[in-house]
């Protein structure tokens, strides 16, 4: 591979790493996720067990679990300023029906939503301020209730005047026969 995959210059990849770290480094979130199989003193273990950097809908399983899943989307550039774009962080919390009740007097999906909102709403941790746009309750099936939070931020748009695709940039096109020389790739 000729691309430097270890140093990806992509704001979504970078921000998703930060979002995941912010979630699993919050001890209250780890406690409320309530996974007795994992050590709360090693919160990074919760990543890809209870916290996912993509929307993962739980399937049929033997053990009841709770999940925080998230995705980050680029939306259209600002119509007034092409150097800026809107990004949306969507957090979907799934709580198994057997784990909804908590010792804190709030339903687990509502409590997790409160904690997530507390971490991200009006936070500048991803560069520019995140603003909560919606907080909705729902269900997936007979086993899981959900809470979906959507945050918006306006952030700089990529304004790179050159291509970063090394396969395309390093290729040589011979105009006579339109063959692509990829020997340097």
PLM feature spans:
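Functionally constrained cores in energy, signaling, and assembly domains
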Residues: 14-16, 27, 49, 74, ...
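Short, charged interaction patches at domain edges and termini
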Residues: 1-21, 77-84, 126-185
């Amino acid at each position: 591979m000729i691309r430097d995959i270890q140093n990806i210059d992509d704001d979504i990849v970078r921000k998703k790493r930060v979002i995941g770290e912010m979630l699993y480094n919050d001890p209250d979130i780890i406690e409320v996720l309530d996974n007795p199989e994992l050590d709360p003193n090693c919160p990074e273990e919760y990543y890809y067990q209870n916290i996912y950097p993509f929307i993962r809908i739980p399937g049929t399983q033997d053990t009841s679990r709770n999940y925080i899943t998230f995705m980050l989307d680029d939306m259209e550039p600002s119509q007034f300023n092409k150097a800026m774009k809107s990004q949306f962080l969507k957090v979907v919390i799934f709580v198994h029906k057997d784990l909804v009740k908590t010792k804190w007097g709030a339903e687990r999906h509502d409590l997790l939503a409160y904690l997530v909102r507390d971490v991200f709403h009006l936070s500048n941790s991803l560069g520019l301020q995140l603003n909560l746009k919606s907080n909705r309750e729902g269900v997936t099936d007979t086993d899981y209730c959900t809470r979906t939070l959507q945050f918006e931020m306006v952030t700089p748009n990529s304004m790179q005047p050159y291509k970063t695709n090394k396969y395309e940039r390093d290729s040589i096109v011979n105009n006579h026969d339109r063959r692509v020389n990829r020997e340097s790739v």
